[in-house]
């Protein structure tokens, strides 16, 4: 949440192509294998949302706050799917059930709409929102399928247009 807050408050920023932080997933005590750390990313995004609604809102117009809440949901989707892919399989259902609660609440509050997401992300989130536990059962290898496997999945939930958009984005790197 610190990085989000800094960027949200910055007048200017410089972006580097090189990664300066790497996540280790190679030991049995890493967060991917710890039930106590499954929801760390959720806690970070809860803090970001609290900060936007309480602190950021004090000094910014309501339109800016609404834009920031929408942006938060869009990047939260990416972070949550990254987290899902890195988790041990026994945590998939529990994580997606919580993810569904959070995104449904944001949709109900009008913080964002599915149309704010890219087509394949929209199709995926809509499928998860329908029944997160069934989604895991129907797509047990989503986390390990790679780009081609995910393209096949996106075709099943969103059709060829979604696949084309996904492939174009994937090729851009």
What positions do the PLM features span?
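Membrane-interface aromatic/basic loop that binds lipid-linked glycans or pyrophosphate carriers
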Residues: 85-173
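Gram-positive cell-envelope targeting signals
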Residues: 10, 30-32, 45, 49, ...
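Nucleotide-sugar-dependent glycosyltransferase catalytic core
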Residues: 3, 9-47, 59, 87-95
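Amphipathic alpha-helical repeat scaffolds of TPR domains
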Residues: 68-82
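Amphipathic alpha-helices of TPR/Sel1-like and other helical repeat/solenoid scaffolds
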Residues: 44-54, 99-103
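Short glycine/serine- and small hydrophobic-enriched flexible loop segments
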Residues: 8, 47-50, 79-83
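Flexible helix-coil transition and linker loops at the boundaries of alpha-helical arrays
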Residues: 54-69
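Short helix-capping and hinge/turn segments at secondary-structure transitions, especially at repeat
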Residues: 15, 50-58, 82
